[in-house]
Amino acid sequence: MGVPKRRTSKARKNKRRSIWGQMAAPTLVECPQCHQLKLNHRVCPKCGYYKGREAIQVAE
């Protein structure tokens, strides 16, 4: 089994772990049908439209 040859320094360890604090929030866009915020390239959960046509039936 592999064993580290040298001890990992605090700086190297912290650099590797630093990405967790920089994760970006998901991009939200306005639905052209109902003007609610939705995820990009996804069906709108509020009205069920995607690219100008109804993709799913939404119970109201």
UniProtKB/Swiss-Prot annotation:
| Molecular function GO terms recorded | structural constituent of ribosome
GO CC annotations on file: large ribosomal subunit
Entry's InterPro entries? Ribosomal_bL32, Ribosomal_bL32_bact, Ribosomal_zn-bd
Q: Any keyword Ion transport?
A: no
Q: Is this entry keyworded Hydrolase?
A: no
The record's Gene Ontology biological-process terms are: translation
Q: Tell me the keywords, alphabetical order.
A: Ribonucleoprotein, Ribosomal protein
User: What SUPFAM superfamilies does its record include?
Assistant: Zn-binding ribosomal proteins
Per its UniProt record, what Pfam families does this chain match?
A: Ribosomal_L32p (PF01783)
Q: Which domain of life is it from?
A: Bacteria
Query: What family is reported?
Result: Belongs to the bacterial ribosomal protein bL32 family.
Note the NCBIfam families from the entry.
Answer: rpmF_bact
Q: What is this protein called?
A: Large ribosomal subunit protein bL32
Origin species: Moorella thermoacetica (strain ATCC 39073 / JCM 9320)
Gene that produces this protein: rpmF
